[in-house]
Amino acid sequence: MAAEKTLQEYGVLCIQEYRKSSKVESSARNSFMGLKDHLGHDLGHLYMESTDPQMSAAVPWPMVEKPTMDTVNSGKEGKGVSEENVSSGDSEGSTSSDHESEQLSSLSVEPCSLTKTHRQLCRSPCLEPRLLKHSDILQDFKPEESQTPSKEVKKPPDVVREYQTKLEFALKLGYSEEQVQLVLNKLGTDALINDILGELVKLGNKSEADQTVSTINSVMRETSSLESQRSESPMQEVVVDDGENLRPVVIDGSNVAMSHGNKEVFSCRGIKLAVDWFLERGHKDITVFVPAWRKEQSRPDALITDQEILRKLEKEKILVFTPSRRVQGRRVVCYDDRFIVKLAFESDGIIVSNDNYRDLANEKPEWKKFIDERLLMYSFVNDKFMPPDDPLGRHGPSLDNFLRKKPIVPEHKKQPCPYGKKCTYGHKCKYYHPERGSQPQRSVADELRAMSRNTAAKTTNEGGLVKSNSVPCSTKADSTSDVKRGAPKRQSDPSIRTHVYQDIEEKLPTKNKLETRSVPSLVSIPATSTAKPQSTTPLSNGLPSGVHFPPQDQRPQGQYPPMMMATKNHGTPMPYEQYPKCDSPVDVGYYSMLNAYSNLSISGPRSPERRFSLDTDYRVNSVASDCSSEGSMSCGSSDSYVGYNDRSYVSSPDPQLEESLKCQHMHPHSRLNSQPFLQNFHDPLTRVQSYSHEEPKFHPKRPLPHLAMHLQHPAVGARSSCPGDYPSPPSSAHSKAPHLGRSLVATRIDSISDSRLYDSSPSRQRKPYSRQEGLGSWGRPSYGLEAYGYRQTYSLPDNSTPPCYESITFQSLPEQQEPTWRIPYCGMPHDPPRYQDNREKIFINLCNIFPPDLVRLVMKRNPHMTDAQQLAAAILVEKSQLGY
């Protein structure tokens, strides 16, 4: 009975659903929404009742179909009010069904509590017809309602996406959107990407005249026309403004008329032709100057034709008559050329004439420049006025730009490439390609050549600066007289030097020649050099810094002849006849002092503090100034000084020559003299102790004080003193031969000759010194400088360092040394006020180039240097060391 009631209930429910389905046909959407609600409730009850997995399959149907119906419902926003009314009406009909379903659930629960089989039996026949009904209803609605809106809403986005993906793919490959549209129109929107790509490749390979790419050609033509319009737009703007952009024109009427009349007749028609030519070009400011006397009637000596043209142009305010009048029957004419040039210059215009106006060009330089740049010459070909297309020459502006105030950018004058866009030369093509735009028209090779030229120019400029930094720092004494007479610089030709020295010696008295040769010169030291020991003999004391010699010239002295040892840098030794013999007993043993120091190697790092001036840095330990033909020491030369009595002069074949050479040297017995001799050197004391047989007592690490350079004997052309400090003699007095060739340094001629140094020193009176005075002067802390008239302008080193001469003993001099001595001197310049003025001027000039502190520092270290170039070189060296 219960089963029958259940079936009846289900039958009633199906009938009600069928009736509702008929309502859906009239208003499909509204009734379907009500049915959906009813089915949702009904299936919800069934889901609660059943645990069978087969029944759970009914659950996804409303869950899947509900979003679809919701989308359909969301698309109908305008019918919201009517939907609410219909749904409210349907809810009344659905209340009964809901009530019946509740009863059904209550009825179905009871049998389920009794037997499970009955629940399955009553559930299976009642659910299947309902599911069939639901599927039929959905099939009725899908083709009518849900499918048509889905096509309308969903398909267009898919088409757009496909089109966008295909378009992006083609654009990435370099094709244009127009080409993609052509291919899609040909193949359809559903074409595969491979087909589209193949068609695009075919389309790209086809010629421009193909019909399939006609639209592309039109687009290309449009773009090219736009570009041409853009390129021509400034031209058009200039043409529009050409009347304002054109320069004023001033015509020399007399010159034009006579040129048209073949220099025989004043043809006014020529003026008319010239004016018309400029008017046709758009010129508005045209002025023609003609002398007023041309208004007179024609005469045999002054033929004039077409005078009415002058009247007409005057009425048009184009022609202007320059004043002229008659005074006592004579014509007084103003210079019309001056009117022409003046007006053209003031109005910044153009002069039309075949005259050069040389007389006016010489009056004012601005007129000369204006005439050179603004003169337009012309020619008449029958009755045609023809100015040149290049008024200022082949490389000048064109005629159009010449007549404009602001010239137009010149068009490319290169020949267009015959291959056009098919040219495969690229940037190497020498022809003009308009599609390149602003790219350089020169080939790559030309660009590289231009870059290499610029780089070479830069390196050349930088090279000059580098050379200036490497200029050796040298201390040289130049007087104002040397600056005035332009002393010769360092020369490599010995013959030139010989003539110079001969001229100087002719002017100097014989009494002073030896003294001139005894004046020591200074040696330039390179700013940066690597100091290497040049002798294997170890020094007992620390080598002073400041002397550097590169190793390239480290050759034994024996390779050179005795009289050519120091002149090998110049090629030719000086003749012996130039050097007169000296009879001074002092000089006999002078170069014997060299033997004492022949084993020393001059090396050590350079220190800027060790560079001293001419008066303060008198080196005695490198007294290698020779009266022979040695050249002065070159910068960085490491040729060694040689004890002449040991090696060079022993091999002299001529005894008289040897005697004359020995007169410039000291006695060979004084091989080594004391360390104080190196430190505290004085002329008479040198003579005394140069004959001493005492071995020196060394003070190894004692710093060398400033030395007075009163006794150094460079020969004519010899330079002996090095600007650095010099080492002490070695402890052994007999180590001479093995190191003679490498010990001391040969010198080369410097930029200042000995005679010049002599001229720069004051002509003082030489004072004789006796042996006792010489011995007594050792104890004087003032060094005996006052005896020479030398006033000390700077402080000597600290006296805290005890002198080294206290332990020195002196032997008696030979009898031949008893006569008084003439002591050479190189001291202060001749005129101290002028000397200071020059120094001040040099200081001011150098301060304009270098930092004042640096200039002051270098000038303090070189107190007697008056050569601005040498000071600048020293400043550059100091600047590089201090890291300015």
Curated annotation (Swiss-Prot):
Keyword Hydrolase belongs to the record: yes
Which branch of life, at top level?
Eukaryota
EC numbers listed for it are: 3.1.-.-
Q: Which residues cross the membrane?
A: none
Keyword annotations for this protein, in alphabetical order, are: Endonuclease, Hydrolase, Magnesium, Metal-binding, Nuclease, Phosphoprotein, Zinc, Zinc-finger
Under InterPro entries, the record lists: Rege-1_UBA-like, Regnase_1/ZC3H12_C, RNase_Zc3h12_NYN, ZC3H12/N4BP1_RNase_Reg, Znf_CCCH
The record ties this protein, via CDD domains, to:
PIN_Zc3h12-like
Q: Which PROSITE patterns match?
A: ZF_C3H1 (PS50103)
Q: Where is the composition biased (Low complexity)?
A: 87-96
MF terms from GO for this chain are: endonuclease activity; zinc ion binding
Known role: May function as RNase and regulate the levels of target RNA species.
Q: What is this protein called?
A: Probable ribonuclease ZC3H12C
Q: Which organism is it from?
A: Mus musculus
Q: What is the lineage of its organism?
A: Eukaryota, Metazoa, Chordata, Craniata, Vertebrata
